[in-house]
Structure formats: C-alpha cells, structure tokens
C-alpha cells in the first residue's frame, strides 16, 4: 500500500464455502479501507463484494482423484499463471482461503517473492498428516484458525497462527427458537422429535442409513409420538435414502427434507448424525446428539493409524472430553445407538447438561470471525 496505490489484497477461494468466507472478509475490509482493491479467484459472492475475478471459483472446485487428474493440466496452468501475475502485481497480502492442496504451494511461491501470505482455514493437520505443519510454516506468514485447539497445535511448532472464532458460530444465535423451527417444519410443539443426518456423501448415506432407520424404529417403541426428520443435501442423496428406507423400514413414517439441516437440528430434541461439520452445527443449534460412523474396515484401520486425536467429533475436540457419545464401526449398530439416544430424548439432566456445555462452547468460538480476519490482514499489510 502506497500513496499512489490503494491497499491491494489477492485472494484465492477454491469452493463455495471459501467464497462465503472471502465475501465476509472483503466486506469487513471495505468497512475499514473503502478504496481497497481485491483480485484473484472468486465466486459470485466475492465478486458481488467487488473482487475482480481472474478465474472463476468453479475452475478449482474439483473433487476426487479422477476429476483432479482430468483437470490437472488446467489446474497447473492456473497455478503457474497466478504465481506469475501475483508476482508482478505485488499485492500487500495474499490470502489463500481453504483449498490447501492448491493454495499452500501457491503461498510458498509468493512468499519467496517477498509477498506476505495468509492461509485462511487451517487444514486438519492436528488430526492427521501432522508433518504438513512444517510446509505450512514455510509457506505462510500467518494461519487464521477457526478453533482454539488449532492455534494450540500451531503454537507447539512455532508457526504463527491467530484464532479468530468460527463464522458459523457468528451466524447462529446463542439461544435458538425450537418452536419457531418446528413451525417451519410442521412439527407439533408437544411431541418428541429426532433428526437423522446420515451424511452428505453417497458412501456415508449408503453405510449409515439402514442402521439409523433401525435405531429410529427402536426409539419409536418407547416414544410412539416420535417425529423423525431427515434433511438430505440434494435430490441424489434423497433418492438414495428413499431406496434404503424402502428396503429396511418401509412402514416407518419420516419427514424427508430438502436441505434444511439447521432447522431440523434446532427443532429436534436429539440428533443422530455422521461426524464432520454437521456435529459442530448441531452443537451450535443446541441439539443433544449421538455421533454414529462406519467406514470400510481397511479405511478404518488406516484412519486409526493416521489420525492422532482421541475423538472424531468437533464438540468433543472443543470440550477436551467425551461430551457427545461417539459410536464407531461395530459399535455403530441400532441397539447401542438407541440406548445412547434414549436419555437425550427424555429431556432430562443429561440433555440439559449437554445443552449448557454447547452454549459455553458456542460463546468461546463466537468472536466475529470476519472482523478478526480483516484485522489480521491489515496488521500484516502494514
């Protein structure tokens, strides 16, 4: 940033979630520096905030080995072109938003050219492939982390990291309105309600749906009024779930929802879900939960070798203890899942204590992440 040139921030977002984060960051930066310039790889939300898109976000949003191999030449071209053009532009700061396989190498290239670099959203280095922390440390001037235990991990390796809180925690109220959510979904206020979330990936839905449905059947024996809501991320997952339900629980009445996972969590007395971001969202919705997860035996064996954490779900990692019951592999079966969910549906001491801890954890990570990220960028730009 000079008197002649406005503050110039380069950004690369690799998928929709990164576009949302990038838009929030740009908005917060514009409030402080109205004439700042933003350039890079951007989606529609970032562009709406004024980011000049050299490439569209879809160019980088590829998943799976086959897809990546099919697009490898194009990805390498974009990577080389961005290295060259950012090197010529000399932005005040480069911010790589998520997409670590693409961005961390790019950050390293730019840092060698004297450009200050930030990686926004820590990869799960604290959980597996921990040696990546050294590459990240070489490539970046600063990591922006959503969760406090991530910062503690980077501190251990003397990699500069700033805990900024989680944008999802900012977006969700500390005290969600259960009855309002039930009104939206058409669920009576005075019944018990269970949310089933068997995952967003096809393999997860295939592995978990049958056991989740059988668990719901067992629970309905105790709670005949039990309303069961099943939010599914898209039409493909819905068709898959309906096929499995027709095979294992054709007579079980459920409410299938197109999306609306957050509303389902807020409306429910308890949730049974696959691990992942859904567990964090469920915690923020203040919905007591059980995590059930199964994968192919070899994959699980490999994961046990590679994963270095005591827990798989984010609520437990945040709490540093088994706050939420995790039933994995052979433990993930209807009798055990139902036994873990029964006390939560009773709305007694167990669920109230879990709710209170969820609220405390929500407050810990509710830090206005967009503002915190913008402040970090401006401090580095000085």
Curated annotation (Swiss-Prot):
<dbReference type="GO" id="GO:0016020">
    <property type="term" value="C:membrane"/>
</dbReference>
<dbReference type="Pfam" id="PF02684">
    <property type="entry name" value="LpxB"/>
</dbReference>
<comment type="function">
    <text>Condensation of UDP-2,3-diacylglucosamine and 2,3-diacylglucosamine-1-phosphate to form lipid A disaccharide, a precursor of lipid A, a phosphorylated glycolipid that anchors the lipopolysaccharide to the outer membrane of the cell.</text>
</comment>
<keyword id="KW-0444">Lipid biosynthesis</keyword>
<keyword id="KW-0443">Lipid metabolism</keyword>
<protein>
    <recommendedName>
        <fullName>Lipid-A-disaccharide synthase</fullName>
        <ecNumber>2.4.1.182</ecNumber>
    </recommendedName>
</protein>
<dbReference type="InterPro" id="IPR003835">
    <property type="entry name" value="Glyco_trans_19"/>
</dbReference>
<dbReference type="GO" id="GO:0005543">
    <property type="term" value="F:phospholipid binding"/>
</dbReference>
<dbReference type="GO" id="GO:0008915">
    <property type="term" value="F:lipid-A-disaccharide synthase activity"/>
</dbReference>
<keyword id="KW-0328">Glycosyltransferase</keyword>
<dbReference type="GO" id="GO:0009245">
    <property type="term" value="P:lipid A biosynthetic process"/>
</dbReference>
<comment type="pathway">
    <text>Glycolipid biosynthesis; lipid IV(A) biosynthesis; lipid IV(A) from (3R)-3-hydroxytetradecanoyl-[acyl-carrier-protein] and UDP-N-acetyl-alpha-D-glucosamine: step 5/6.</text>
</comment>
<keyword id="KW-0441">Lipid A biosynthesis</keyword>
<keyword id="KW-0808">Transferase</keyword>
<comment type="similarity">
    <text>Belongs to the LpxB family.</text>
</comment>
């Amino acid at each position: 940033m000079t008197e002649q040139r406005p503050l110039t921030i380069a950004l690369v977002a690799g998928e929709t979630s990164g576009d949302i984060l990038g838009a929030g960051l740009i908005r917060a930066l514009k409030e402080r520096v109205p004439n700042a310039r933003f350039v890079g790889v951007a989606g529609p939300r970032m562009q709406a905030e004024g980011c000049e898109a050299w490439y569209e976000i879809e160019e980088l949003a590829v998943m799976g080995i086959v897809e990546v191999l099919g697009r490898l030449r194009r990805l390498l071209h974009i990577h080389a072109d961005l290295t060259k053009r950012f090197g010529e532009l000399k932005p005040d700061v480069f911010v790589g938003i998520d997409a670590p396989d693409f961005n961390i190498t790019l950050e390293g290239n730019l840092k060698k050219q004297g450009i200050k670099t930030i990686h926004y959203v820590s990869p799960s280095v604290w959980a597996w492939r921990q040696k990546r922390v050294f590459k990240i440390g070489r490539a970046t001037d600063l990591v922006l982390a959503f969760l406090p235990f991530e910062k503690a991990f980077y501190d251990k390796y003397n990699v500069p990291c700033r805990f900024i809180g989680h944008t999802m925690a900012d977006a969700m109220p500390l005290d969600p309105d259960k009855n309002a959510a039930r009104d939206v979904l058409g669920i009576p206020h005075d019944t018990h309600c269970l949310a089933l979330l068997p995952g967003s990936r096809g393999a997860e839905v295939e592995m978990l749906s049958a056991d989740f449905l059988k668990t719901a059947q067992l629970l309905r024996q105790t709670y005949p009024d039990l309303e069961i809501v099943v939010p599914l991320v898209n039409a493909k997952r819905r068709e898959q779930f309906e096929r499995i339900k027709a095979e294992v629980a054709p007579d079980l009445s459920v409410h299938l929802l197109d999306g609306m996972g957050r509303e389902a969590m807020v409306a429910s007395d308890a949730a049974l879900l696959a691990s992942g971001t859904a567990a964090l969202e469920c915690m923020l919705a203040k919905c007591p939960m059980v995590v059930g997860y199964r994968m192919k035996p070899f994959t699980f064996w490999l994961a046990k070798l590679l994963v270095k954490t005591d827990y798989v779900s984010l609520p437990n990692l945040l709490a540093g203890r088994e706050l939420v019951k995790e039933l994995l592999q052979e433990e993930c079966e209807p009798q055990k899942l139902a036994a873990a969910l029964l006390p939560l549906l009773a709305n007694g001491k167990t669920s109230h204590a879990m709710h209170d801890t969820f609220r405390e954890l929500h407050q810990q990570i509710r830090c206005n992440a967009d503002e915190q990220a913008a402040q970090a960028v401006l401090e580095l730009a000085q």
